[in-house]
């Protein structure tokens, strides 16, 4: 099989040396001899011997300034780097270890193993800058990926081999839902998972490491972290490093891969910081002028090829809950399914706090999910939309001013809202309640009966934070009602 991008042979690099002429934070200007200027994206090494700060920095060539000068971005703190320091051109881009042996370990954006220093140095390495698969090798998929979460499976079904995003502002549950998907899908998936921690909290990375060990799926997972305390160069490249590992499993091992990215907004934010440091003219809302290109270069590599797939789940922070912000808006164009987490739903105590009217999926179509699934989903959406339209009237005049038909619809909508909530495995340690999984067929049947009015006599409380019909029957009985 032909791989569409270069593999890195460490022994084949040609090294030339230059010297540092300017250091401004993470931006380092380096002068090379004439005729020996390194190519864009080449990795450079600068050795710092400054007492306790002895280390080797990795710089990436970002611009050619002319007169044998290159402008680079450091992927590590530049403390101790001074003018005149010797810099070596490795002759190749940043590369990361690939292969079956990366599973069960944590790496940084440079491919250094964090849990076992030195591990992986003798593995095959691939450049993180690779071309997407050729058009003729692509294989679009329409197979549904079952999660066991009612609100997702019914209203925004996920595509196996597709790109899925969880949108939301600060504190509405994006990371919890990503961890929930790891728990639900990785356990039952049987393939390989790769997790990219892009600019998020170190604590969350440690929590995930512990959770994966407890769930016994760490042995099938590779983790790559570039946390929020690291330089923007690292945060900008860590997603590419994780994706490169995932591509090896897809292209060389012929496996279906799950790729989790938390958070794709931090990738965009790091690109904006780098763009500013390089002196580029800012675009809309201060973002980099190359935003669409950078997002496209990442997203186009996340795709399905013949017989193999990368299924990507990406958390996307929405600044100030503004969906017109260029960062989330640019991401929308590349997605197969979107799950939007709403502060209004969160305030009602409904978890996961998914806004069913704002979320969408390209496979919610009778030709893919079936006529019954599509019909029930559309009826649920119709009822919830009508309830939303009536809320202003209810707030001003009260529910008693509605027609009998609308009163009945409002009561069903309130039950539907609560029935879309569900206990999650990732939150068990906080709630004390075990997570529940509901098969798609049972979800469709339950909501069909609910829309037809078969549960109108059951109290609203019975629908809150439960699983399927068995849970509903037990809770209804405890409240003095029967299904």
Curated annotation (Swiss-Prot):
Keyword terms: ATP synthesis, ATP-binding, Cell membrane, CF(1), Hydrogen ion transport, Ion transport, Membrane, Nucleotide-binding, Translocase, Transport
EC number: 7.1.2.2
GO cellular component: plasma membrane; proton-transporting ATP synthase complex
Recorded catalytic activity of this chain's protein: ATP + H2O + 4 H(+)(in) = ADP + phosphate + 5 H(+)(out)
Gene Ontology MF terms: ATP binding; ATP hydrolysis activity; proton-transporting ATP synthase activity, rotational mechanism
EC top class named in words: translocase
Functional summary from the UniProt entry: Produces ATP from ADP in the presence of a proton gradient across the membrane. The catalytic sites are hosted primarily by the beta subunits.
Protein name: ATP synthase subunit beta
The organism's taxonomic lineage, starting at the top: Bacteria, Bacillati, Actinomycetota, Actinomycetes, Mycobacteriales
GN (gene name): atpD
């Amino acid at each position: 099989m032909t791989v569409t991008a270069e593999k890195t042979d460490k022994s084949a690099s040609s090294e030339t040396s230059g010297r540092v002429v300017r250091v401004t934070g993470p931006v380092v200007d380096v002068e090379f001899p004439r005729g020996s200027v390194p190519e864009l994206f080449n990795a450079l090494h600068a050795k710092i011997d400054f007492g306790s700060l002895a280390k080797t920095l990795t710089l990436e060539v970002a611009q050619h300034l002319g007169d044998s000068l290159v402008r680079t971005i450091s992927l590590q703190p530049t403390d101790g780097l001074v003018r005149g320091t010797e810099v070596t051109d490795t002759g190749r881009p940043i590369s990361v270890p690939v292969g079956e042996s990366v599973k069960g370990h944590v790496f940084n954006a440079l491919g250094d193993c964090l849990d076992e220093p030195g591990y992986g140095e003798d593995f095959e390495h691939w450049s993180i800058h690779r071309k997407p698969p050729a058009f003729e090798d692509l294989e679009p998929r329409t197979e549904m990926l079952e999660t066991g979460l009612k609100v997702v499976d019914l209203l925004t079904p996920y595509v196996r081999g597709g790109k899925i995003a969880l949108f939301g502002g600060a504190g509405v549950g994006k990371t919890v839902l990503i961890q929930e998907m790891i728990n639900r899908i990785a356990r039952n998936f049987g393939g390989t998972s790769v997790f990219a921690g892009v600019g998020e909290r170190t604590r969350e990375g440690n929590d995930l490491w512990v959770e994966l060990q407890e769930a016994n799926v760490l042995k099938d997972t590779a983790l790559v972290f570039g946390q929020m305390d690291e330089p923007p160069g690292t945060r900008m490249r860590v997603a590419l490093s994780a994706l490169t590992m995932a591509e090896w499993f897809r292209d060389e091992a012929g496996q279906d891969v799950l790729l989790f990215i938390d958070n794709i907004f931090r990738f965009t934010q790091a690109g904006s910081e780098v763009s500013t440091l390089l002196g580029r003219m800012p675009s809309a809302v201060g973002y980099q002028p190359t935003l669409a290109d950078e997002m496209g270069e990442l997203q186009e590599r996340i795709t399905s090829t013949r017989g193999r797939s990368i299924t990507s789940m990406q958390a996307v922070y929405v600044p100030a809950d503004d969906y017109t912000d260029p960062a989330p808006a640019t991401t929308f164009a590349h997605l197969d399914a979107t799950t939007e987490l709403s502060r209004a739903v969160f305030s009602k105590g409904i978890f996961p706090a998914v806004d069913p009217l704002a979320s969408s999926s390209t496979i919610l179509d009778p030709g893919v999910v079936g006529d019954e699934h599509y019909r029930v989903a559309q009826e649920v959406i119709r009822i919830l939309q009508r309830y939303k339209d009536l809320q202003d009237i209810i707030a001003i005049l009260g529910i008693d001013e509605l027609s009998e038909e609308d009163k009945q619809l409002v009561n069903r909508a309130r039950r539907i809202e609560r029935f879309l909530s569900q206990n999650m495995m990732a939150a068990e340690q906080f709630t004390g309640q075990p997570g529940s999984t509901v098969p798609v067929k049972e979800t469709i049947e339950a909501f069909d009966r609910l829309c037809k009015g078969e549960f109108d006599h059951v109290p609203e409380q019975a629908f809150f934070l439960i699983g399927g019909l068995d849970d509903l029957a037990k809770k209804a009985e405890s409240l003095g009602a029967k299904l």
